[in-house]
Amino acid sequence: MKICTIYNMIFILLLSLNFMLKANDLAVMKVADVPAKALYVTQPKGEVDRLFVLNQKGMVYIIKNGLTLETPFINISDRVHGSLTPGSEEGLLGLAFHPDYTKNGYFYLNYVNKNDSSIVSRFSVTNNPNIADEDTEKIILGLPQPYGNHNGGHLAFGPMDGMLYIGFGDGGKWGDPYNNAQDLNSLLGAILRINVDKGDPYSIPNDNPFINERSKRAEIFCYGLRNPWRFSFDRKTNDLLIGDVGQDLWEEVNWLSWEESFGANFGWRIMEGNHCYNPEDFCDTTGLVMPVFEYPNNASYLKILIGMDEREATGCSVTGGYVYRGAENPHLWGTYVFGDYCTGRIWSFTLNNGKPVKFRNLRPELKKHSKDVPLFISSFGEDSSGELYVVDYLGAIYKFVSNQ
C-alpha cells in the first residue's frame, strides 16, 4: 500500500513537471495577415476585439476578431514620403492612442512627409469607430530631417504621467556627421517628452530635465541615441527600455528606471554599444549611460534582401520590445522580449542589479512549437491587457502564446 502511494506520488510529480515544461514552451500564433510593410501593432486602452496595425505606406489597418478590415482606419499616403525602396526608413513610422481615446477619440501619428520632415500630428476618429477623419490633422511638431535614414519615429504615452514621448534618430548618414545626438540644441538623436493636453500645440512638462536651460531644447527627455527605432515603458515599474540601432559593429538595449532616465545621455556618437566610436580609442565616458545588453552587428541586410542566407548571423538592426506583463504566459512575467529585424532572432532576459540574467534565445523554441514564425521583425506590440505581439514587415501579426 505504501509502495503504491509512493509510485502514485512520483507519477503525479512527473505529470506535473511535464505539464509545467509544456506550459513554459513558447509559441507564436498568427493573428492575421496584413498588407506588406507592416511596422507596428497596438491597441487603445480598454479595447478588447480590435488591433491597429501601422503600415509604412501611410495607412493604419484594423484587425477585428482575427480578420483584417479591407478599408483602412486612416490613409494619409498622400502626405507621407512615397519612395519606399527596400530598406527605406521613411514613411509612416509611429502610432499612439491618447490614454483617454475612448472619450476624446484622439490618436497620434509620426511620419516623414514629402519634404523630408518628420511630422507628429493628432487625428480624430469619426462616429464610425473603424474610420478616422484624415481632415482633422493637427500638426503638433515638425522636424526637418537632414538625411533619409535614422528617423526614429516611435510614439508612446507614459503609463504613469500621460505625457507623449517621441523618438528621433540622429538625422542619418554615416557616424552622425553633425554630432546631433550630443547637441542639446537639436531634437535629433533624442527621446522627447511633451504635454499634448495643455498648450497649443503642446507644452513642456515642468519637470523636464532641461526646461530651465536656455541653450538646450526643453522638449528633450534623454539623448545620445543613434536610432531609437522602438522603445517602451514597463507598465508595472515605468522603467524605460530602448532598442538603439547601431552603426557598424554593435546593437544595444538600454534599460533605466524612469527617474534615472531624466537627462540621461546614452553615449552616441562617443560610444557604439559599450565601445568607443568617435574617438575610436580613449573616449571620455564620464556621465554616459552604458547599455545593459549589446550584440554584434554581423549580418548583411543587402544579402538578406537578395535571398542569401545570413540567418546564422546574430543580426544587424535591433528591434526594441516590451517587458511582458500579461496574464496568459505567466512564465514570461517581468521578462523583456526583443529581437533583430534582419535575422528574425528573438531573445529575452530580466534585469538583476543592472545586469541581464535568465537570457534566452527564443527563436529555436518558437520554430519548434509554431506553425510559422516572423522573418523580418519590424516591431513588437502590446494589447490593452499586456499580451505581447510581434510584427513581420512582410505582412503578418503574431501573438505570443504558451504551447500546451
Specify the residue positions occupied by each region the protein language model found:
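Bacterial Sec-dependent N-terminal signal peptides
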Residues: M1-N24
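Short, conserved catalytic or adaptor-binding loops enriched in Gly and charged residues
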Residues: L21-N24, P129-D133, F210-R214, T285-T286
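Acidic, Gly/Ser/Thr-rich repeat motifs that build Ca2+-stabilized beta-propeller blades
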Residues: A23-G175, R230-F233, N238-G246, W250, ...
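Beta-propeller fold detector
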Residues: M29-K30, L69-D78, I131-L141, S203-P209, ...
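A conditional alpha-helix N-cap/helix-loop micro-motif detector
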Residues: V31, Q145, F221, H369-S370
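Conserved blade-ending motifs and adjacent loop-strand segments that build the rim/top face
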Residues: L225, P356-S384
